[in-house]
């Protein structure tokens, strides 16, 4: 039996995550039930990562989905798959997938990570976000160049 993914809203939990992010020095924004971070980066990157955090429920457990769309125009499915594969070969914590844009008739590439959120601590969130942002910020420009050219 497949595990069902349900988008959920938990204002109390989202407030805690929002406060953690502020404590870490980010400037989070709420957009519906998502928490967004814009223009973040770590290390030698160029602070070009935009992140969305979304709380979902799977099989009775809360999962925090962390995702970042590459800033690039839409491309063919084949090119998006090639870029996603290159991202996956280069990163450990971030997993890249192609995303179909039905209205535009093209594809984009998204980096993602999931965190078990039933007992998520601030230190754990900080460490995993650091790793995710560092990886994505280090490779996103290379991947975007591959998408464009």
What are these regions (language model features)?
Residues 1-52, 94-95:
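Charge-rich, low-complexity N-terminal segments
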Residues 43-73:
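Long, continuous compositionally biased terminal/linker segments
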Residues 27-33, 57-60, 99-105:
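Short, ordered beta-strand-loop transition motifs
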Residues 7, 11, 78, 119-126:
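Ordered, soluble secondary-structure elements with a strong preference for glycine-centered loop motifs
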Residues 63-108:
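Short, internal acidic amphipathic alpha-helical interface segments
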Residues 93-130, 144-148:
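Well-ordered alpha/beta subsegment
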């Amino acid at each position: 039996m497949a595990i069902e993914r349900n988008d959920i809203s938990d204002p109390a939990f989202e407030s805690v995550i929002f406060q953690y992010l502020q404590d870490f020095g980010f400037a989070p924004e709420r957009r519906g039930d998502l928490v967004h971070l814009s223009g973040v980066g770590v290390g030698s990157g160029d602070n070009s990562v935009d992140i969305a955090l979304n709380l979902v429920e799977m099989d009775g457990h809360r999962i925090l989905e962390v995702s970042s769309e590459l800033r690039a125009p839409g491309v063919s499915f084949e090119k998006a798959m090639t870029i996603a594969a290159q991202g996956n070969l280069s990163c450990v914590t971030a997993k890249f997938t192609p995303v179909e844009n039905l209205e535009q008739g093209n594809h984009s590439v998204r980096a993602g990570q999931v965190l078990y959120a039933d007992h998520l601590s601030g230190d754990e969130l900080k460490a995993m976000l650091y790793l995710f942002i560092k990886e994505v910020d280090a490779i996103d420009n290379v991947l975007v160049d591959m998408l464009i050219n």
